[in-house]
Swiss-Prot record:
Protein name, per record: Putative germin-like protein subfamily 1 member 9
Alphabetical keyword list: Apoplast, Disulfide bond, Glycoprotein, Manganese, Metal-binding, Secreted, Signal
SUPFAM superfamilies reported for this sequence: RmlC-like cupins (SSF51182)
Subunit comment: Oligomer (believed to be a pentamer but probably hexamer).
Top-level taxon of origin: Eukaryota
Glycan-linked positions: N78
Amino acid sequence: MKSFSFLAVLSILAITLSLSKASDPSSLQDFCVGVNTPADGVFVNGKFCKDPKLVTVEDFFFTGLHEARPPNPKTGSNVTAVNVNNLPGLNTLGISLVRIDYGVYGQNPPHTHPRASEVLYVAVGTLFVGFVTSNPENRLFSKTLYEGDVFVFPQGLIHFQVNVGKYPAVAFAGLSSQNPGVITIADTVFGSNPQIDPSFLASAFQVDPKIVMDLQTKFIKP
């Protein structure tokens, strides 16, 4: 019986440890304002902690999400991110926020967040959103959202949003990491540096190599 209890405790500890490693580490202090220099700091979760005596209220403050940003001509959208890089007080807190402005028929093209799940809130307009599950099913979950609607994108899965209304749209999203990361699928595959061999991509996508080379010219980084 004691042996069973000991094994049960070990199993629970193993599960707990695996879950804790699946998200940003928990903070062991009230806050850890992120700084990029080691002077008077302690390295925690990718950033140095600012000396608590030097922390000010501005370290926990960001302004600008009330402002609409002009859409990117290529995608028709613009993402304003609030993460540990521009709000250092988020360091070790495991959260971040974005505002997404969509032009008419603009889109936030297929992408993933390798380190975070996302909950999206539609503030203005109408969006068609969705995500695709992993292999082998690659099942699409999609829905048209209206003002006040909320949708969740699981961590790591490819997802997208498209403005299907006749007017600009605005959405806000919370993410479960201080620095969730973004991998935009088309940019990554066709705009890599150095470029992936077109013949390989042509075989992978089962298209003519000329099509791949044309796509690579559209996504190449300046």
